Amino acid sequence: MALRFPRFSQGLAQDPTTRRIWFGIATAHDFESHDDITEERLYQNIFASHFGQLAIIFLWTSGNLFHVAWQGNFESWVQDPLHVRPIAHAIWDPHFGQPAVEAFTRGGAPGPVNIAYSGVYQWWYTIGLRTNEDLYTGALFLLFLSAISLIGGWLHLQPKWKPSVSWFKNAESRLNHHLSGLFGVSSLAWTGHLVHVAIPASRGEYVRWNNFLDVLPHPQGLGPLFSGQWNLYAQNPDSSSHLFGTSQGAGTAILTLLGGFHPQTQSLWLTDMAHHHLAIAFIFLIAGHMYRTNFGIGHSIKDLLEAHTPPGGRLGRGHKGLYDTINNSLHFQLGLALACLGVITSLVAQHMYSLPAYAFIAQDFTTQAASYTHHQYIAGFIMTGAFAHGAIFFIRDYNPEQNEDNVLARMLDHKEAIISHLSWASLFLGFHTLGLYVHNDVMLAFGTPEKQILIEPIFAQWIQSAHGKTLYGFDVLLSSTSGPAFNAGRSIWLPGWLSAVNENSNSLFLTIGPGDFLVHHAIALGLHTTTLILVKGALDARGSKLMPDKKDFGYSFPCDGPGRGGTCDISAWDAFYLAVFWMLNTIGWVTFYWHWKHITLWQGNVSQFNESSTYLMGWLRDYLWLNSSQLINGYNPFGMNSLSVWAWMFLFGHLVWATGFMFLISWRGYWQGLIETLAWAHERTPLANLIRWRDKPVALSIVQARLVGLAHFSVGYIFTYAAFLIASTSGKFG
């Protein structure tokens, strides 16, 4: 008999129902559960798949470069970045009528095009690319890297080139390689690119391979490096009247500490960024030589962890046993990696707008909004994934004997205290924040707006003042001209920083008031509740009071049969599932806040946010309804415009989102009954009954239906907000 899907599980392959297909898809990437899997094959498969992942990433980025070079307007955008709309790619759509063709023909293009809101134009411009030829060269190079990655993946699946398990578990060598080889060397290489290509380009000098060795990045060459006069590299920086991309007002410095923003581009100084990357390269190149490998020198991570016993004796055995626990658990390692990456991604969202690194991106408002929202949603999914794999670690990989009385065991021992404190914080934040909002709504509805409870965020204002914002009148740290902190930086980075913090043309330390105070606490509620669900899911993954044997049922299970009460909906997977809803909800509030505050700043009517954000009706009416009115109006038989497709996507997103509820608010028995009825009718209908199926149709399992519902909810939610965000911002600012 021919092998049926899934080949990795003979048990499933012999299942006579459609469960075979869905369970096969669900467990396709759960390598640990496959037939004939060994630890060695598990590690080798994952390692090889990383090369495939890299190939896809390189191919995708190559495609971005290629399509902009082929169909974009990069060269004309470079001439006038503030007024030419960057084109992502052409649209070839047989459904477009004449009005659509006209609506989407923009940016100087001959036919319909999509505008780029990704920020790639600003990025490529900042790093020194200027022509379509540059873009094609980059696309070809990335295509080459993609091919190399595929070859690498194939190579490491061949018997001769398969690494051993001991190679994968050599943590010190891997850390040294990643710290020095990846972070250190790549940061150094990036510094080199900025100094040799990007900074000259910002001063009107075109450096390419043909003149790379002839153009000195600094008039004195390597002299100051070898003579120890490094400060010479910081002398004569670009002036405040410098026109980016030209020699007008340009200096000769390559590594500076100016602080603040380039006045014309409103982005960080390129010479500051080169300096920053050089410092990071230096730190990581040292860090990558700290761990003991072949030469018998340096730290052993295991020794470090074993030696760390907390003083006083009241915190148990500290980190004893952690080295082997982490090193032998891929889920633990993945959980740590995802947690770090999630935090970094959210920080990228925050810093891309507050400290823009790319020239002119701060004045491209739609791109700013899209970038912030994009990175926050990605951070949310990554962070929930971190806790999911933490829970799987506790179920599959945690060994109580190995971790007796260490930090992991103690987390489990006092999980009730952790969970109840998170619960208390969530309840406190929720009731008080909602109470304040609702009180304010009642006051406005009853005609006494002066009775609103409006709380000034004085602690946050004090922190902003400590960083140099003078508006609030606190005389503290950097906003105090007599203090040592102020005087220490006065001759280098401080003037640039202080002018950036105190001028209102950027998003650095925005002025905050009672509306910000309220939404800050609403977001804190969302974050604490999401964390509560995720932490409880992981800490209760092995067992809870109602179900002490939970770990025996695995990561995702619906119930322990109908006869055992209190076992439904409490698997670690269910916690992850619930947390994703809260995560989406929270990031909704975060992005609403960011977008509304910025729209009013960009339009110069910030009082609208300040006055309307203190009560719920204000958010619904003056943010959501006011900014979606064009989308709700949409398209009609008499015409359309370039927002019509966003209006269609806004509608479509709502439909996908609503479809999720069909799976979420229904029971399996209903679907099973429906399927039985349809199958019965099919088998008794002439002609139709000539078509048979090999697999008996059965309803999705409870867990699978939840996943399908969650997927539709998430995708619809994000599609809807993406359409709203891009249309409402580009409709106002282009």
From Swiss-Prot:
Which terms in the Gene Ontology molecular function aspect does this entry carry?
Answer: 4 iron, 4 sulfur cluster binding; chlorophyll binding; electron transfer activity; magnesium ion binding; oxidoreductase activity
Q: In the UniProt record, does the keyword Plastid occur?
A: yes
Binding, chlorophyll a B3: M662, Y670
One Pfam family named in its UniProt record: PsaA_PsaB
Residues annotated as transmembrane: 46-69, 135-158, 175-199, 273-291, 330-353, 369-395, 417-439, 517-535, 575-596, 643-665, 707-727
SUPFAM superfamilies membership: Photosystem I subunits PsaA/PsaB (SSF81558)
Membrane topology per the entry is: Multi-pass membrane protein
Keyword Manganese assigned: no
Q: Provide the binding site for phylloquinone.
A: W671
InterPro entries, per the entry: PSI_PsaA/B (IPR001280), PSI_PsaA/B_CS (IPR020586), PSI_PsaA/B_sf (IPR036408), PSI_PsaB (IPR006244)
| Binding-site residues for chlorophyll a B1, renumbered to this chain | H654
PROSITE patterns (alphabetical): PHOTOSYSTEM_I_PSAAB
Q: Name one GO biological process term.
A: photosynthesis
| Cofactor binding mode and count | P700 is a chlorophyll a/chlorophyll a' dimer, A0 is one or more chlorophyll a, A1 is one or both phylloquinones and FX is a shared 4Fe-4S iron-sulfur center.
The EC number(s) this enzyme carries: 1.97.1.12
Per UniProt, subcellular location reads as: Plastid, Chloroplast thylakoid membrane
Main localisation: plastid
- Catalytic activity field: reduced [plastocyanin] + hnu + oxidized [2Fe-2S]-[ferredoxin] = oxidized [plastocyanin] + reduced [2Fe-2S]-[ferredoxin]
Which sites bind [4Fe-4S] cluster?
A: C559, C568
Q: Which UniProt keywords apply?
A: 4Fe-4S, Chlorophyll, Chloroplast, Chromophore, Electron transport, Iron, Iron-sulfur, Magnesium, Membrane, Metal-binding, Oxidoreductase, Photosynthesis, Photosystem I, Plastid, Thylakoid, Transmembrane, Transmembrane helix, Transport
Q: How does it assemble?
A: The PsaA/B heterodimer binds the P700 chlorophyll special pair and subsequent electron acceptors. PSI consists of a core antenna complex that captures photons, and an electron transfer chain that converts photonic excitation into a charge separation. The eukaryotic PSI reaction center is composed of at least 11 subunits.
HAMAP family in the record: PSI_PsaB
Q: What is the recorded function of this protein according to its Swiss-Prot or TrEMBL entry? A: PsaA and PsaB bind P700, the primary electron donor of photosystem I (PSI), as well as the electron acceptors A0, A1 and FX. PSI is a plastocyanin-ferredoxin oxidoreductase, converting photonic excitation into a charge separation, which transfers an electron from the donor P700 chlorophyll pair to the spectroscopically characterized acceptors A0, A1, FX, FA and FB in turn. Oxidized P700 is reduced on the lumenal side of the thylakoid membrane by plastocyanin.
The entry sums up its family as follows: Belongs to the PsaA/PsaB family.
Record's protein name: Photosystem I P700 chlorophyll a apoprotein A2
Species of the source: Acorus calamus
**Gene of origin?**
psaB
